[in-house]
């Protein structure tokens, strides 16, 4: 599953590099399970490429690659004006399999598995951001699902954008951007 996700993101980055982009905003990773293909999953990565008008090297990752971010264009610009740039769209999950129990009481092993799955998924996402030389993760979304694949399973999925600080003395937005809706 991780190899398929990484391949989809790599292909999107390669296309952005071919276009001369500095990064990708609004990136989303769609995971589809097509009928007739059993347990196979299809990963599709889409996003909007952006390029700096000035020297865009500060917008690229420390490794010189195109950055990826699931932030909207507006959120990206706010982040940029605050002195940060995205590094990488981070995505981690963890699935804990459990034995079925037929009692109508709290299932301590299920409760503990839920806590463990969440903590492991978050730790993996943080480690992925650190490997990309980021200082934090913004726009984090955590989803939890329970499924039955022969056994009962609890799964946590964590998504976000890792960021790094750029120029310390860059101008920071003093007020939010306002668009006049009454203009003709």
State where each predicted segment sits.
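Short, well-ordered alpha-helical segments
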Residues: 1-28, 90, 95, 102-142
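Hydrophobic, ordered structural segments
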Residues: 4-58
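Intrinsic disorder/low-complexity detector
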Residues: 39-110, 161-184
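C-terminal functional regions that serve as terminal interaction/effector modules
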Residues: 132-135, 140-147, 153-171, 184
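Short, conserved loop-to-beta-strand elements that form functional interface hotspots
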Residues: 23-35, 136-148, 170-177
């Amino acid at each position: 599953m991780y190899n398929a996700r990484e391949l989809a993101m790599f292909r999107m980055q390669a296309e952005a590099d071919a276009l001369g982009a500095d990064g990708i905003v609004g990136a989303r990773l769609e995971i589809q399970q097509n009928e007739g293909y059993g347990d196979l999953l299809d990963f599709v990565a889409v996003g909007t490429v952006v390029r700096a008008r000035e020297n865009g090297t500060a917008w690229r990752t420390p490794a010189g690659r195109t950055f990826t971010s699931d932030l909207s264009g507006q959120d990206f610009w706010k982040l940029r004006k605050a002195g940060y740039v995205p590094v990488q769209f981070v995505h981690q999950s963890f699935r804990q399999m459990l034995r079925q129990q037929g009692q109508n009481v709290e299932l301590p092993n299920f409760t503990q598995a839920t806590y463990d799955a969440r903590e492991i998924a978050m730790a993996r996402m943080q480690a992925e951001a650190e490997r990309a030389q980021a200082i934090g993760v913004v726009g984090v979304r955590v989803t939890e699902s329970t499924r039955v694949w022969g056994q009962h399973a609890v799964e946590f999925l964590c998504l976000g954008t890792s960021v790094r600080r750029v120029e310390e003395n860059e101008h920071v937005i003093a007020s939010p951007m306002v668009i006049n809706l009454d203009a003709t």
